[in-house]
Amino acid sequence: MNLGDTIVAIASAVVPNQGSIGIVRLSGAAALPIARQLFQDPGQQTWESHRILYGYVRHPQTQTIVDEALLLLMLAPRSFTAEDVVEFHCHGGIIPVQQVLQLCLGAGARLATPGEFTLRAFLNGRIDLTQAESVAELVGAKSPQSAQVALAGIQGKLAQPIQQLRGQCLDILAEVEARIDFEDDLPPLDEPQIQRDLTQVLEKVAQILQTSDRGELLRTGLKVAIVGRPNVGKSSLLNAWSRSDRAIVTDLPGTTRDVVESQLVVQGIPVQVLDTAGIRDTEDAVEKIGVARSLAASQQADLILFTIDAAVGWTAADQEIFQRIVATKANQPLILILNKIDIGQPEAIEIPPQVQGVVKTAAAQHQGVDELETAIANLVQAGKVGAADLDFAINQRQAAALAQAQQALIQVRETIAQGLPLDFWTIDLRSAIQALGEITGEGVTESVLDRIFSRFCIGK
């Protein structure tokens, strides 16, 4: 990859016969000369930065008009990449956009690799690595809340505390190295104060690390399994919740033989709902497989909706299934669903301590769905499941680097407590500083950059 090349790519989604506008983006030193070759400006408008020009895209040899278009000019350094950037806004659809792309390639541009526009923005110092990663997360956001967290990352709300922590570590290192280099000219280090400073940094590191799991939930979604014995209304609950007929519903126990999935958004949180086969002892070979998959789904879920028939109450079979689920995954959040309340109200039920919420539903009548969503949202907000309100969230790469910094800082404290020489302090302090720098992109290796930006789409 030659970063001195001028690159080009389609920057809009290409949907056959459906797109209204197609965008072809150029970035690099030759972006403006290439645009001048291809774009005819009938109004002789001034080619200044941050202006929109109206005209035609012409073939440079035949002068054939390829498309009527708008041209956006964003010259360095006031552009996304901090290079000269030009965008052709063409008519949508595959043919016009591909024709403009081919003309740009023929005029000397190179096809951009995935994420290369954002990579150039990073390498040119316009954004740091956390902001670059947040761009990809915003594009792939599955809910308004995950989009908001990604946008916070783009605005630097993650980079700021990381840079502050790195600065604090650099200050401590400077104090230590000054005592090494000028031992006779400076007073001894205030070791208790250094320990207090390290404790403060570690507390902030721990707070940021806590956002990792919740951020991952926003990115991938909350996995919710509807579990219970046969014919308690699990499939009816899925259909009512998803407002569709995803699952087959009959009065016959054992109708659902496999896990049925549906994708929903609950108060900004993406949710993958799993309707599982009714759990019971059976001789039916196919149903046995379904039961096994139900138990597996319950273990993988972030939250279980344990469903019983309210008209019948809590039965011995319900108790047996509940114990099997609790035994396989301790401390798993559960909501008890009392379904079929339109048929009969349950007698007093002793709620097991593992249950963290009770919701009454009449799934066949589409009743209780709003209450269920509120109960799930309350668990999330309380931090018992996944993602409470987040100002920002770190991803897995960032969490791994932050954990390295945390371990190095803990080692510094132990080194001080053991009374080891100051040279030993600096080793782990430098490790912590390096790990924190990797989060924002300082000193990050080329292989890490390749891995990060390969996940981007071409044109971003």
UniProtKB/Swiss-Prot annotation:
GTP binds at residues 231-236, 250-256, 275-278. Exhibits a very high intrinsic GTPase hydrolysis rate. Involved in the addition of a carboxymethylaminomethyl (cmnm) group at the wobble position (U34) of certain tRNAs, forming tRNA-cmnm(5)s(2)U34. This is tRNA modification GTPase MnmE. Signal peptide: none annotated. Belongs to the TRAFAC class TrmE-Era-EngA-EngB-Septin-like GTPase superfamily. TrmE GTPase family. One of its GO terms (molecular function) is GTPase activity. Homodimer. Heterotetramer of two MnmE and two MnmG subunits. One of its GO terms (biological process) is tRNA wobble uridine modification. Its main location: cytoplasm. Keywords: Cytoplasm, GTP-binding, Hydrolase, Magnesium, Metal-binding, Nucleotide-binding, Potassium, tRNA processing. (6S)-5-formyl-5,6,7,8-tetrahydrofolate binds at R25, E87, R126, K460. It comes from Picosynechococcus sp. (strain ATCC 27264 / PCC 7002 / PR-6) (Agmenellum quadruplicatum). Its cofactor is K(+).
